[in-house]
Amino acid sequence: MAVPGRAMDETITANAAQFDSKTIIDTANRMGGGPLNSLATFQARTPNARIYRAFNSYGWENFADPTYTDGPADLFYCGPDGESRSVVERLITDVGLRPMRLGDVDQADVVDSVLRPWFALASGQQMGRHLAFKVLTP
């Protein structure tokens, strides 16, 4: 879901019957205190939905043009394993990024924490918003 973070609780509650039993990606950031994600509301209102947290740690520029010098950037996400995971990973790949699962939905705070260094570099260090991260392995 991509609605303003401040509208998430109301949107989830109003549409809970339609959302339940679906695969949902929580993409919105609720700025201004409290958790960035809306996972608690999703879990309370849509107990049969498969909830993921992704697409929340980069600026939109990285989704519109995911082209980088050293190949695709990694998009950190979390959520349940299973068939819905492959759908989420296919979507991330289709956008042009490499899916990097950090675990089940209990890792949402870890996914959310990626936003902090992104903001520090994009704004604080004035590197611009079109930047992303990549996990390097031997």
What label would you give each PLM region?
Residues 9, 48-53, 99-101:
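Short, structured loop/turn "capping" segments at alpha-beta junctions
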Residues 18-69, 84:
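Rossmann-fold NAD(P)-binding glycine/threonine-rich loop
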